[in-house]
């Protein structure tokens, strides 16, 4: 079938900010789809609110709108651009829900916009739990015993019939938002009321739990001629009951017999044919391990996290082909881009094993509830490829960057067996490592199977890993056993531990005896057809398929899994760096391990190595490729932390030298530099013990900011007010970084400013200066950033420019540098300097049209900024006002305090741009999920130190017609200024404020931290209740002021004469 000629312009909706459940996989899918549609000659208009994506670059679509993904804003774009069609299945759940809203409100019909790809009725049939169940019954496909409820009462009726445990799945949400497993009445009440709140349709599916069944997924494609194929099938190691995004996954499935495989394949194809899916689709099934009984769990009628994994696992570009299917092309007429010779209708075959392990944020949220269930908690994931299951699992484990390199925890010996078994019986993110520990202690596989329901096949594989450890210990230094351990994915570090050697000695032993990995190609067809994909993985076999060219090469280190503090912004910079390397005529090689990202798409670089980002794995590639040098400044802290280790092997670090990278991090050297160039910083000291820290604080004076050196995202950083808090911190936090001391600094309050600059060794260009709305003390990644600065004087701007140039030149930066300043009452101070790409690079690149990562890369290669047409200093300002607003995923993480502070907590960001600050903020806040209403009720409960400041805020809100509720202390303060406020009771009292929040009486909560156990607990409960009821909770008065200004600009104030 030829492609459709009746449509010319297609609108693509992106997935918005990165949140738990919806991460970088949609940037990858959206980028592929836009390029595929342009390739076919269509005009593409993209709307997405996330500036940190490749997809929102001007080259990707013909027109790019970075606007909030809400009905009103998209409707405006549709009226303005008059597209012929809308493609909704590439923007995750956000894109799908938008398409449904635009259809239901009549916007699509009024503007003659057709939906492409899967029909809306099919989407609703797959997403609406009631319709889906009816269709499955018609097809005779078994679904778990279930009921649809719209109220909590209905849920209890269903419980009477089937009993516990029950699984709750809200309709039209993703990542299992609001869902969970209930074992008793209390949990049922809480989870169902929560689920109804998060479901746009106020609808939940309750189903009898089939926990313990195997969870199997099929990633399928279908076109309009009813050609349908399975791209990949995957098996969750964790049985049903843990969200697939939080499960360890293996592809292809390992424990299915051929009969089971074919049976589930047939069902998957039958279901997508019945639904009339056109494009990619993910089918999740549950299989009883003891019979041929199965159930269908759910169908995602769109490109998903699993399809990104399937694309990277097989090399088959699902999103690209799904976009082409949407405009009428069929599988049997499109070539598979990987082979270039076979058609897309051939099902991929794998001659290797893939392991995916989720990356959880519990290293940042130590108090977060770790138990896993049907609501997703992982922020990202890693994938590894091996020739044996053991090899791919161990490679994936060391890709996680948890400080874990093997099947066990670093301090595993110290736990007693009862504790280990207790941890195994709970489903949490560390269970895999505790299983390894239990096997080491001789626990039987039967006992572990009974506790976990994990298939014996996998338990035997874990046992094999432990057996090899014992063999290494018994045959220390034996080359045969070294080779054998390498075949099964053991790292040099692990072998060194068992051989009683250093890692370096094992590495040398391997080199002397030529025990090196070879690299195999990922070609979708198990070498059945000719293929020329430059996509490789390492393994210890004989034939090497990665042919080394004689071109000069530059190796770029990626940033690994998405986690808090290191998001998709670093992938953005990596991809741009690669483009610049290619334009300069070098061969660009990427090493990365994140299946969700654009950088791990085989078509981006000249060669892609899908390998762990560890010293050993990267050195193996360098030994083969012998690049001119390695670039570390675009891969976040992951890459920077490898610089030292690679340099020890004589590898050339391109760009800012290792010595200068270390000067920016080393306290004493950095202070010496600041004195020399005459740039002030807050008074500070270094401490290696609690006693020293207390002495430092006494000299500087409280409050002080404490943090370990060498961390990203403000990990383990705190503001402390007294000796007791400091002692507590020193005993907890010195863990955060044992080799490095703790920094104790004077805490300066004032405006925080962030600057990104590029330096080629001679010229420093500053694309822009950003002012933070939240004062210093809130992590820059959690602050709202504004460009251009709104409240700075000419003098302050000149000082910032001067200091930035001095710092970049003083550190001999070649490439990018990110600096944070604070403007205190007595001048500008430098807070920190990061000699690398930062979180704000994509944001500034989009605003100013200065391709920062590309310029930095060109400077690294040796080009001069003046030759590219740039002058030193701050570049001309772009027109308009732009804000970058953070987006949090607190509703997915229980027991995490949402108070903003020096430790980063946001998972993503949105951009708002307009002609005034208030309009830009309105877009930023709206895009980040804060509903800005021009009237309503605000609840205020603030600490004593903030009571004076909250008065002005209350006055403004009162004048625009907001009703104020306040706790007694805050209300008394407001009464002094004649501001009316209704007093609400403390927790547990009469007219208790939690009840008011739960009843929906409140639209905004303003709550600032008070220290002290009792009040901290109260404050924590207030903040959690607010988040769990989906109400904006502002913990910084600066954010509250910004919101108030926006509300004020939307309405008229009412004052008596």
Curated annotation (Swiss-Prot):
- What SMART domains is this protein classified in? CPSase_L_D3, GARS_A, MGS
What is written in the cofactor note of this entry?
A: Binds 4 Mg(2+) or Mn(2+) ions per subunit.
Per UniProt, ATP 2 binds at: 707, 746, 748, 752, 777-780, 820, 832
Can you tell me which residues bind Mg(2+) 3? 820, 832
Q: GO: which molecular function terms?
A: ATP binding; carbamoyl-phosphate synthase (ammonia) activity; carbamoyl-phosphate synthase (glutamine-hydrolyzing) activity; metal ion binding
E.C. code: 6.3.4.16, 6.3.5.5
Reactions catalysed according to its record = hydrogencarbonate + L-glutamine + 2 ATP + H2O = carbamoyl phosphate + L-glutamate + 2 ADP + phosphate + 2 H(+)
Binding site residues for Mn(2+) 4:
832, 834
- Protein family: Belongs to the CarB family.
This chain's protein is named: Carbamoyl phosphate synthase large chain
């Amino acid at each position: 079938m030829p492609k459709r000629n009746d449509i010319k312009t297609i609108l693509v909706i992106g997935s918005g900010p990165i949140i738990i459940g919806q991460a970088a996989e949609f940037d990858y899918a959206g980028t592929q789809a836009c390029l595929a549609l342009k390739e076919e000659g269509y005009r593409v208009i993209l709307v997405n609110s996330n500036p940190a994506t490749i997809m929102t670059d001007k080259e990707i679509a013909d027109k790019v709108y970075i606007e909030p993904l809400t009905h009103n804003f998209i409707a405006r774009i549709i009226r303005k651009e008059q597209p012929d069609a809308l493609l909704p299945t590439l923007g995750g759940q956000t894109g799908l829900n938008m398409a449904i809203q635009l259809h239901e409100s009549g916007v699509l019909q009024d503007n003659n916009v057709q939906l492409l790809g899967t029909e809306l009725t099919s989407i609703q049939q797959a997403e609406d739990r009631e319709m889906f169940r009816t269709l499955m019954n018609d097809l005779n496909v078994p679904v778990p015993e279930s009921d649809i409820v719209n109220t909590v009462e209905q849920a209890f009726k269903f419980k009477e019939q089937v009993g516990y445990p029950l699984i709750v799945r809200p309709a039209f949400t993703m990542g299992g938002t609001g869902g969970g497993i209930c074992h008793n009445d209390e949990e049922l009440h809480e989870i169902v009321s929560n689920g109804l709140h998060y479901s746009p349709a106020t609808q939940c599916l309750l189903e009898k739990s089939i926990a313990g069944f195997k969870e199997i997924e099929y990633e399928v494609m279908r076109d309009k001629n009813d050609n349908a194929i399975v791209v990949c099938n995957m098996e969750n190691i964790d049985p049903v009951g843990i969200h697939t995004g939080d499960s360890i996954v293996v592809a292809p499935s390992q424990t299915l017999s051929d009969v089971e495989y074919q049976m589930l394949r047939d069902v998957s194809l039958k279901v997508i044919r019945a639904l009339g899916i056109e494009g990619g689709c993910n089918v999740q099934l549950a299989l009883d391990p003891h019979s041929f009984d199965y159930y269908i769990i759910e169908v995602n009628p769109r490109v998903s996290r699993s399809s990104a994994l399937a694309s990277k696992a097989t090399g088959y570009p699902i999103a690209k082909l799904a976009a082409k299917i949407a405009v009428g092309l069929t599988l049997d007429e499109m070539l598979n881009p990987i082979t270039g010779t076979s058609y897309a209708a051939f099902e991929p075959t794998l001659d290797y094993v893939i392991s995916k392990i989720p990356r959880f944020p519990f290293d940042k949220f130590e108090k977060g509830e770790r138990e896993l269930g049907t609501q997703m908690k992982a922020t990202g994931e890693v994938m590894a490829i091996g020739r044996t299951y053991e090899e791919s699992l161990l490679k994936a484990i060391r890709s996680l960057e948890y400080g874990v390199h093997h099947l066990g925890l670093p301090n595993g010996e110290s736990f007693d067996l009862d504790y280990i078994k207790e941890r195994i019986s709970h489903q949490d993110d560390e269970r895999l490592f505790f299983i390894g520990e239990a096997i080491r202690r001789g626990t039987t596989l039967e006992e572990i199977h009974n506790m976990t329901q994990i298939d014996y096949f996998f338990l035997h594989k874990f046992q094999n890993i432990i057996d090899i450890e014992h063999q290494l210990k018994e045959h220390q230094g034996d080359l045969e056993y070294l080779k054998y351990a390498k075949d099964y994915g053991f790292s040099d570090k692990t072998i060194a531990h068992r051989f009683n050697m250093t890692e370096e000695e094992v590495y040398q032993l391997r080199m002397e005896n030529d025990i090196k990995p070879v690299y195999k190609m990922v070609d979708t067809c198990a070498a059945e057809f000719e293929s020329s994909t430059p996509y490789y993985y390492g393994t210890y076999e004989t034939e090497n398929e990665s042919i080394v060219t004689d071109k000069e090469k530059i190796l770029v280190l990626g940033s690994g899994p998405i986690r808090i503090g290191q998001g998709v912004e670093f992938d953005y910079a990596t991809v741009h760096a690669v483009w610049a390397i290619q334009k300069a005529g070098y061969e660009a090689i990427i090493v990365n391990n994140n299946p969700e990202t654009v950088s791990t798409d085989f078509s981006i670089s000249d060669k892609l190595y899908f390998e762990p980002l560890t010293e050993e794995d990267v050195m193996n590639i360098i030994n083969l490729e012998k690049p001119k040098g390695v670039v570390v400044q675009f891969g976040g802290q992951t890459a920077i932390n490898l610089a030292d280790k690679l340099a020890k092997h004589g590898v050339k670090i391109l760009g800012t030298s290792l010595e200068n990278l270390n000067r920016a991090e080393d306290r004493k050297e950095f202070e010496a530099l600041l004195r020399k160039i005459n740039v002030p910083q807050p008074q500070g000291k270094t401490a290696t013990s609690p006693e020293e820290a207390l002495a430092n604080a006494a000299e500087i004076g409280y409050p002080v900011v404490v943090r370990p050196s060498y961390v990203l995202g403000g990990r383990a950083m705190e503001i402390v007010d007294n000796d007791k808090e400091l002692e507590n911190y020193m005993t907890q936090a010195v863990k955060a970084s044992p080799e490095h001391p703790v920094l104790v600094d004077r805490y300066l309050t004032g405006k925080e400013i962030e600057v990104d600059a590029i330096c080629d060794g001679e010229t420093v260009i500053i694309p822009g200066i950003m002012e933070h709305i939240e004062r210093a003390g809130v992590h820059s990644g959690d602050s709202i950033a504004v460009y251009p600065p709104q409240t700075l004087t000419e003098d302050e701007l000149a000082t910032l420019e001067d200091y930035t140039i001095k710092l970049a030149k003083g550190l001999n930066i070649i490439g990018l540098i990110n600096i944070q300043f604070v403007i205190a009452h007595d001048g500008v101070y430098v807070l920190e300097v990061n000699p690398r790409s930062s979180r704000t690079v994509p944001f500034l690149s989009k605003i100013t049209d200065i391709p920062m990562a590309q310029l930095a890369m060109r400077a690294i290669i040796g080009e001069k900024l003046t030759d590219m047409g740039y002058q030193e200093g701050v570049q001309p300002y772009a027109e308009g006002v732009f804000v970058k607003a953070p987006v949090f995923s607190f509703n997915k993480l229980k027991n995490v305090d949402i108070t903003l502070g020096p430790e980063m907590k946001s998972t993503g960001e949105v951009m708002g741009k307009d002609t005034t600050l208030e309009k830009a903020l309105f877009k930023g806040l709206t895009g980040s999920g804060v509903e800005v209403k021009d009237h309503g009720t605000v609840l205020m409960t603030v600490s004593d130190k903030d009571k004076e400041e909250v008065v002005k805020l209350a006055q403004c809100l009162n004048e625009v017609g907001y009703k104020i509720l306040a706790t007694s202390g805050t209300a008394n303060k407001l009464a002094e200024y004649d501001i009316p406020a209704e007093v609400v009771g403390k927790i547990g009292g009469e007219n208790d404020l939690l009840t008011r929040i739960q009843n929906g009486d409140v639209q905004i909560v303003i709550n600032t931290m008070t220290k002290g156990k009792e009040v901290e607990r109260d404050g924590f409960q207030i903040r959690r209740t607010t988040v769990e009821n989906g109400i904006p909770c502002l913990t910084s008065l600066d954010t509250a002021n910004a919101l108030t200004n926006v509300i004020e600009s939307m309405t008229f104030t009412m004052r008596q004469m």
